[in-house]
Structure formats: structure tokens, C-alpha cells
Amino acid sequence: MTQQITLALSKGRIFEETLPLLAAAGIEVLEDPEKSRKLILPTSRPEVRVVLVRATDVPTYVQYGGADLGVAGKDSLIEHGGQGLFRPLDLKIAKCRVSVAVRADFDYREAVTQGSRLKVATKYTSIARDFFASKGVHVDLIKLYGSMELAPLTGLADAIVDLVSTGNTLKANNLVEVEQIMDISSHLVVNQAALKLKQAPLRRIIDAFASAVPQG
């Protein structure tokens, strides 16, 4: 009996950069998620399907068995905590960084040096809390889910902690990157129970991904 394999992906960059890895495993997604309204997409392998979820929800779907495996950014994995997940591969895709950014006219160094209590807007509260605690900087964290750049511009926050790729969005909103917290890439994550129950098919996919990941 063929075992059903469910892969959780998020739309956008991670989805697009995962396609060559799927191809290496002999799997082709048969519908374009940008054109289809479906949240479950068929593939060229009848036993493999792709479910489309929010990037931050991928670890949760995999942890609780809604998916057998998934591709998630390191940022999402840290915020999730990683419970119940086997993380065999750094796929080295969707690379970016988590950084601190402020208004161009805000003296961040001076505020930190003087021991000011900073208001920081972010959706990455665990990453931000650990980073500022390690520096001995006192912060009030404000949880936001989008349009992070607005927070300093409206006076809601002194700084933001967010993903940065090219930095163009920051520049367009008169913000500057003042500290880099960590580099981010996407990882393959696998449900630990599924790895035991569906070991052979999952191992084939993991091994195919591993062979396709660029070295160095």
C-alpha cells in the first residue's frame, strides 16, 4: 500500500526556491499556487501532495502531523521552538537576515549607550528578546504581523526587528539597518512520528534534497 506524503510549503520565495529540490526528488507540483485558489496541490507523484500554509505555520503543521514534512525559515523555527521536529537539512534557500532598523534620524547607538529603554516592534519576539537581553538593552516589545516599517515612522516604536533581504524597502521608508542579528535560510523539517511510520518514502525525499543542496 502506497503511503500518502504531505509537504507543507508557504507561497512566494520559499515555494519557488523549493521547486528545484522537488525536481531532484522526481516531484513536480502540477498547479501554480499564484493562479490556483486551491490550498492542497497535486504533484506528479500521486502519493505526494503539497499543502499551502503561512510561513509561520509550517512548523506547527509538521509538529502536529498536518504535514509529514515542510520547508521553513530559521526565523519561523526559532519562534516556534522546534518541538516535535526533526531538522535534517539546511536547504540554503530563501536567504536573508534578521536585523534591527530605525529611522535615519534616530541615534540608535546613543540610545543604547545611555541605557534608554527602547520600544521595538517585531513579529519575531523570541529572537528580539534574546538578542537585546544578550546586549543588556532594556526593551518593550510590540508584537506586529506586517507593515513593520510603519512603526518607527508613526512613533509606535523606536526600532524594528525584521527580515531584510536587499534593504530596498527600508531605504524607501527612510529607515536604516543598524545591527544584524542573524543570517536566515530555509530548512527541511520532518514530523518525528512520520519519520518512523513512513521512513522509506521520507528518506528518499530527504536524500534527494540533500544531493541537490548546493555545497559551500
Curated annotation (Swiss-Prot):
It comes from Acidovorax ebreus (strain TPSY) (Diaphorobacter sp. (strain TPSY)). GO terms for cellular component: cytoplasm. This is ATP phosphoribosyltransferase. Gene3D superfamilies: Periplasmic binding protein-like II. GO terms for molecular function: ATP binding; ATP phosphoribosyltransferase activity. It holds the Pfam family HisG. Its EC number is 2.4.2.17. Keywords: Amino-acid biosynthesis, ATP-binding, Cytoplasm, Glycosyltransferase, Histidine biosynthesis, Nucleotide-binding, Transferase. It is an enzyme of class 2 (transferase). Catalyzes the condensation of ATP and 5-phosphoribose 1-diphosphate to form N'-(5'-phosphoribosyl)-ATP (PR-ATP). Has a crucial role in the pathway because the rate of histidine biosynthesis seems to be controlled primarily by regulation of HisG enzymatic activity. It is found in: Cytoplasm. It catalyses: 1-(5-phospho-beta-D-ribosyl)-ATP + diphosphate = 5-phospho-alpha-D-ribose 1-diphosphate + ATP. Lacks the C-terminal regulatory region which is replaced by HisZ. GO terms for biological process: L-histidine biosynthetic process. Heteromultimer composed of HisG and HisZ subunits. The gene is hisG. CDD domains: PBP2_HisGs.
